[in-house]
């Protein structure tokens, strides 16, 4: 049974306020039937030094990725994961994590690949919860299996792949590419991208024609999302009706921007190219541009 929506007034201006919850809303409902909380961090060990009471850990690297192929787990493995974590198909799942929900948004996105209908993000993530000095726990909960069904992953409308991104470069009116990495990564000065990802590449730069919109500009210093007016200004150069594809280094930061565009601003046609620069920058004879962004210089600070 789905949990009620958070009526927090600031969320009403977003396109899909049902996809985001506040710390106060979640704190009042921890342990409620039909509500499961998932912590998913860039630093997986943070869970061990204190987490939301009743929250389970999903490690993006170990739990969501196929151990052999560079791809996500299949429906059978996802169902097994859900059953280990005690998550039912009709549960409301609230995901949170460190670094302004960087990897939490990625985990939410993977849930959506398997069609889990009610997945929400905790505004501000782990840092906001801790900053408000809310309850934490060291107890790792054990839940009974919820008999989660095997549902095969559906990539269509959520993922973009290298062949179609490459093909769009020669098409008139093709996809709008948004590079959500830092300006130094986009320009090619930092060819290795995020230094914590351990994902070096052979070439630096960006996909030709891409717009650089750093994912972190969408959040405030405390990790909370900016207001609708600020986000509209930040993404003013994008058309919600266009085929929009976001990318970063390995798809993690892009998932955060995907969430902003889809659920906070109401973009209907936004996908994540999760192969991202780790794939593009290592492939032979791929077109690459370097240099600073010239298409969008909006500041909302």
Curated annotation (Swiss-Prot):
It comes from Corynebacterium glutamicum (strain ATCC 13032 / DSM 20300 / JCM 1318 / BCRC 11384 / CCUG 27702 / LMG 3730 / NBRC 12168 / NCIMB 10025 / NRRL B-2784 / 534). Contains two rhodanese domains with different primary structures but with near identical secondary structure conformations suggesting a common evolutionary origin. Only the C-terminal rhodanese domain contains the catalytic cysteine residue. GO terms for molecular function: thiosulfate-cyanide sulfurtransferase activity. PANTHER family: THIOSULFATE SULFURTRANSFERASE (PTHR43855:SF1). Pfam families: Rhodanese (PF00581). Its EC number is 2.8.1.1. Keywords: Repeat, Transferase. This is Thiosulfate sulfurtransferase. It comes from the Bacteria. Substrate binds at residue 253.
